[in-house]
Amino acid sequence: MSVLIALTISIGLLAVVATWLFLGPLAAFHMQIWQAFVAWASFFHNGGKTDGLVKTVVCMVFGAVVGMGSVMIIGPLGGLGALAAPVAVGIGAAVLVLGAHLPFLAAIPSSVYGFATVAGLILLGKDMTPTAAIVPTILSIIVGAAFGWVSEQLAGVMTKK
């Protein structure tokens, strides 16, 4: 079986499991399936394997923390009026890129994905403050990246002759 067909089967089946988990047992923790899917994609974007797993979790969590901080400084920047949020996001974006000077934070796209996932959860408007959004976001990132790793492993088993 080709790798692409094996990944099709593996990812398709595991997406069913992940969605069930997030809409069922994990829903009480405010974890989000869409955040997990972003982390799952980031895992493959980072080349998969253990290295892709580590890069995804470390950089997405870093991005999420920076994103949380960016949202939190919008209030103190309120004197800027309509520019408060754009300036806060710009500061956060600069921090993400500066962080890439550290080799373990060099996967800038994954850091951006992390920033976007926490900001997205905050913007859903379900009484989700920045500090309330960070833990479910980090948990969703970890679980999503783990699903990426498992899907790769399962596909590997299906392609062995």
For the regions a language model picked out, list residue spans one by one.
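Alpha-helical transmembrane segments and their membrane-interface boundaries
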Residues: 1-48, 130-133, 137, 144-155, ...
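Membrane-interface starts of transmembrane alpha-helices
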Residues: 6, 29-32, 80-88, 105-109, ...
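Transmembrane alpha-helical segments of multi-pass membrane transport proteins and ion-pumping complexes
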Residues: 11-24, 60, 64-72, 89-101, ...
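Pore- and pathway-forming membrane helices of multi-pass small-molecule/ion transporters and channels
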Residues: 12, 16, 29-47, 92-94, ...
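Structural signature of hydrophobic alpha-helical transmembrane segments
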Residues: 20-36, 73-90
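Alpha-helical membrane segments and adjacent membrane-interface helices in multi-pass membrane proteins
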Residues: 33-71
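Cytoplasmic-side transmembrane-helix entry/capping segments in multi-pass membrane proteins
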Residues: 53-62, 83-86, 105-114
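Membrane-interface helix termini and inter-helical loops of multi-pass transporters
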Residues: 74-79, 124-132
